[in-house]
Amino acid sequence: MATDTIAGDRIRALAGRGPPGIAVCVAGPEGVRAAGADGLADIAAGVQASPWMVCPWLSVTKLVTATAAMRLAELGVLDLDAPVFEHVPALRQVRPAARAGRITARHLLSHSAGFSNPMPVRWVHLEDQLAPGPDLFLNGLLARHHRLRFEPGSRAAYSNLGPLVLAAAMTTVTGRPFAELVSEEILGPLGMGTTAFTYTPEMRRRAAVGYHPRLSPMRLLLPRWVIGKPAGPWISLRPFLLDGPAYGGLLGSLDDLARFLLLHLRDGELDGVRILSRAATASMRQITVRGRRYDLGLGWFRPASQRDADPPFVEHLGGGVGFYNLIRIYPSRGVGVAVMGNATSYHIDAVARLALAD
């Protein structure tokens, strides 16, 4: 099916006073139905935004982590319902110890393990800075945030710690570094050639600049070495990488995110490559545990405020300093939408809804 272009003026109308640059696509099982972009990927250089610009995916990465975990489960390598304690030495610091010993991969996938959610705004480094190793990073985090808030499985509470623990378990059971595992099991087979945990030369050429409101108080929390030059009402950000890949470290294009969206719209198969069974793909969208802010499935979530949405949807957001992204599926309609923008915050829900309404 031919892909329609979403006109730039329509995208700008959708975004309102949105990010400097934005890219949107709408897809169904047959493929991408429409895609487009508007604005600037780099204000200073005058580079136009496009579906091929590369942005940090931030927490949209969690859905890729979840998909990789489900694949390992189907391969018989990862037991979703067995405690992960023996696979993750850092969990020995967590209290109460009895609760920590009951945490399973299923709990980690559904954000129902009981972890708190510390602010990750400083969990970043520049490309030329030395990053902490995954074990050292996780050990340090759990030493500081070691108390579980509730019994695993009793409710959901979104946390950036869970995916890091899950990645550690995945590394142990496979004997493969997490980034390598995701590349070989998900990104490579799906042909997502401009998505990775570090910039390739081609990705660097396509990289969008992130922007944060110049007068925002949150600017005071940012590491000084991330802050770039002013650009009108914005402050630019220097290209950064995340210390914990599994919770938000992927970098990639909307074009590649559309391929990942199609994988889930096509029940786990894309271009003749099956990553997950139909049953496993559907189970990821099934809401199993409720929380105050989000209700969770095995990767996908639904805002608690949207429990009665018609039509119902599941999604994952990727928000952080400088970028804001979304991937959403309406299962009953068999359609999905993906949005990427290079600003900390904008009306992304309105963009997604109006893009689908077109």
What are the functions of these language-model segments?
Residues 40-42, 83-92, 122-127:
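Short linear capping/connector segments at secondary-structure termini
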Residues 305, 311, 339-358:
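Short, gly/Ser/Thr-rich active-site loops of penicillin-recognizing serine hydrolases
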Residues 6-11, 24, 30, 54-81, ...:
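Active-site SXXK
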